[in-house]
């Protein structure tokens, strides 16, 4: 039926319209576009809302052999009486939820100025495809709600219901469940509607901090929080906290946006906690920013830190290649004792410590802005799928809904007839805050550069004994995405919003892209090359990052 076999030469498909790559002009530019001409009186209004979509009263099973995977001979609760197990499937494959640890939520922040309305919506999910994003944007709840664009992203929380479809009861059966998706769509749309309709005049207090072991020593490493476990070790440990307060009462929070790059996953690898639905550390980070952190809860709280209230929206960052809290990370728990065992306790410590750092930075060096111009630009483009596994997943309807273009579906999928994914990237600026989206797990060097070791934080840049080392001579040259965000007039605080506007897996830079010569996309190449197995293909950087750079350089 198809002949995709990987190991492509990277040559363009024969006969493919060159316009598939990149874009000509953004399709949304505000203010100044046909539906958002004016900035009005220049007053920024901000609204925020949240809704849970946590499954309730769902079917569970008895894990008789203790392998954390459901087998067809294991008993289950057949609540709907249809004779089959309709579980809530989690990341990993055949892993059905048994209980709930934390709520999973959709959280929205709306920005309104003159004719422009933009929303940042982040959902506790591993990832969301374009078809799901469209169903949220077109939800009946939003009929009549005037929004120029909704940026939709996922926190990448692993032990949330499978929204991609990759991790069902067997490799060929989707993990997507209609009752879960319907609840997610409804929750997301309701959060957007409330955020827009409750927007009120706002001011901004904003700060950053580095989540490294000793902020006064850039070489002090980062293993109180996370690590980069793929060479080269390059990542951005910056946490940005943007608190929007009422213009009429600057002591009262409307909502807060927090950005930091880290995989939410540690309890997934626990022998005891991994079958429970949870948002992982983002739940605790959001809660502690709102409610506060005591000195007893975190060594990073020098004194008891009051919460700032409101609703906190967490936006994940450039976490590809692998930025996470595994393999030797030891976040300090209550009393400062390092936590070395993965599980819910570690999730809570990561979120609590990050919140303590955020609240401290805001109190110590928060910068206030009352003039907050709002602008938005967004463009669509396409990226080619060469990954055999993704071909199969789309062909058998394993993955969620997503249009495919640039190929003939009646012919075999092969070099010369690869499908392309329509994608989108968006740049949003709110005063000094500049945010750009990436449609997956962006490798951090594509965000910051850092090939000279300047973004390695005391870790060795490379282990020279590993095979298939990166070719730094072929690495991208500046300016990098972060540089181009900062190049916008007035921007002091750059943010990369990962897993946003779509989800394409890992966005691996071409200079360090290696496939197994015998079984590409099925077996990872020797060395640090797991991420290639879950990427679009060798041209992933060219097709996804270059249009983002193009958008960032666009000026009307």
Located regions from the model:
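C-terminal motif of bacterial Sec signal peptides marking the signal peptidase cleavage site
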Residues: 2-4
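Conserved beta-alpha junction segments in alpha/beta enzyme cores
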Residues: 16-153, 161-311, 315-349, 355, ...
């Amino acid at each position: 039926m198809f002949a995709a076999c990987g190991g492509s030469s990277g040559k363009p498909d024969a006969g493919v319209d060159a316009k598939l790559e990149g874009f000509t002009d953004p399709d949304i530019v505000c203010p100044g576009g046909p539906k958002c001409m004016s900035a009005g009186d220049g007053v920024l209004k901000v609204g925020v809302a949240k809704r849970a979509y946590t499954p309730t009263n769902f079917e569970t099973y008895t894990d008789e052999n203790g392998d954390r995977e459901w087998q067809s001979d294991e008993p289950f609760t057949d609540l709907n009486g249809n004779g089959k197990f309709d579980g809530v499937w989690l990341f990993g494959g055949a892993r059905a939820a048994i209980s709930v640890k934390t709520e999973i939520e959709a959280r929205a922040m709306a920005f309104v100025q003159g004719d422009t309305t933009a929303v940042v919506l982040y959902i506790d999910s591993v990832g969301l495809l374009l078809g799901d994003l469209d169903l949220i944007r077109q939800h009946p709840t939003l009929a009549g709600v005037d929004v120029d664009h909704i940026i939709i992203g996922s926190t990448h929380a692993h032990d949330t219901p499978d929204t991609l479809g990759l991790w069902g009861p067997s490799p060929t059966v989707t993990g997507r469940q209609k009752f879960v998706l319907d609840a997610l769509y409804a929750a997301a749309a309701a959060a957007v509607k409330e955020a827009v309709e409750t927007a009120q005049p706002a001011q901004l207090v904003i700060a950053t901090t580095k989540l490294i072991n000793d902020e006064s020593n850039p070489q002090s490493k980062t293993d109180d929080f996370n690590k980069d476990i793929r060479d080269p070790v390059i990542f951005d440990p910056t946490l940005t906290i943007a608190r929007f307060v009422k213009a009429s009462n600057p002591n009262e929070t409307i909502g807060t946006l927090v950005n930091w790059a880290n995989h939410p996953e540690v309890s997934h690898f626990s022998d005891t906690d991994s079958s429970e639905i949870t948002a992982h550390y983002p739940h605790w980070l959001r809660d502690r920013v709102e409610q506060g952190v005591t000195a007893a809860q975190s060594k990073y709280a020098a004194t008891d830190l009051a919460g700032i209230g409101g609703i906190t929206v967490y936006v994940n960052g450039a976490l590809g290649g692998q930025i996470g809290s595994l393999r030797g990370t030891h976040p300090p728990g209550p009393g400062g004792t390092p936590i070395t065992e993965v599980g819910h306790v570690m999730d809570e410590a990561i979120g609590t410590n990050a919140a303590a750092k955020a609240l401290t930075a805001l109190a110590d060096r928060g910068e206030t802005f009352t003039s907050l111009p709002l602008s938005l630009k967004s463009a669509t483009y396409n990226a080619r799928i060469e990954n055999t596994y993704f071909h199969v997943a789309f062909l058998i309807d394993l993955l969620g809904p997503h249009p495919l273009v640039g190929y003939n579906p009646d012919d075999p999928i092969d070099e010369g007839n690869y499908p392309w994914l329509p994608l989108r990237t968006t740049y949003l600026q709110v005063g000094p805050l500049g945010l750009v989206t990436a449609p997956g797990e962006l490798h951090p060097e594509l965000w910051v550069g850092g090939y000279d070791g300047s973004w390695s934080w005391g870790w060795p840049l490379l282990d020279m004994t590993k095979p298939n080392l990166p070719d730094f001579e072929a690495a991208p040259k500046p300016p990098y995405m972060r540089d181009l965000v900062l190049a916008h007039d007035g921007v002091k605080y750059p943010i990369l919003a990962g897993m946003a506007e779509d989800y394409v897996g890992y966005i691996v830079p071409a200079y360090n892209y290696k496939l197994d010569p015998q079984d590409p996309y099925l077996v990872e190449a020797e060395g640090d090359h797991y991420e290639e197995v879950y990427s679009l293909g060798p041209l992933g950087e060219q097709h996804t990052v270059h249009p983002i750079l193009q958008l960032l350089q666009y000026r009307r």
